Amino acid sequence: MKTYEDLEGDGGSNIIGQVVQLGEKLRSRLDKIKHKVALMSGKGGVGKSSITANIASCLADRGYKVGILDADLNGPSIGHLLGVGNELKLETKNEGIEPGNGHQGIKIMSMDMLLKSADTPVMWTEEANATAVWVSTMESTAIRELLADTNWGELDYLLIDMPPGSDRIDNIRSLIPELAGAVEITIPSMLSQHFVTKSITKNNKMGVPIIGLVENMATYVCPHCEKEGKLFAGEDVQKLTERKEIPYIGKIPFDTRVSQSKSGNLFYS
């Protein structure tokens, strides 16, 4: 049996050429996109995807060309929020896979659009004992392919809806060295602020610019009198941003009308 050292060349696979070609393909896509911004949260359930969709909508309203990459591979929701579900039949052309066109012409690529049905889970392997390293490698490869194979065209902004936590920013930064920065999203609960602080610290150590922090569900809007009240007890989020020396972008109230809206119409006017 031959060992790895006994092999001559690459066996005809031209693996180096393939890697170079993949890198050039990704680079050609990204070069047509002016600004790439990651939307992050320390934990789930803070409304990150809804805010991503609303930011994209606001940018589109101002005449910018916008795309969203749903990087939350195991819990994709951007397609649903913007009216593009898994019923969309993706079309492959010479230029690549055509992204879904959501609300206001926002270009979308999401794992949700690649699944057979709405209740189909993302399964990276049939092996029950698959290691975390193996799954993480497959996730990283999937992100690269979604970025490189999608025909984004020329965009002013590509928003990247990240999964909860701070560990996946490593993959995004390696794929997009020119990442403009990250927008952190939190709710004013002590637990959420605990995790978003970790995310901020991680980005600072990695040199990822923090564009600012959005405080979601800052208050509760009464559906009857429209008065606002506090929902959570925690540190004042503005003080948190001052302590971490990052911009405070603003706060958004918890509004039940958003949850009552239909898919593709979850936007503030």
Label each residue range with its predicted role.
Residues S28-K34:
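Phosphate-binding P-loop
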Residues H35-L73, I200:
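Walker A/P-loop phosphate-binding motif and the immediately C-terminal alpha-helix
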Residues I33, G44, D70, I78, ...:
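Residue-level signature of catalytic and energy-coupling elements of molecular machines
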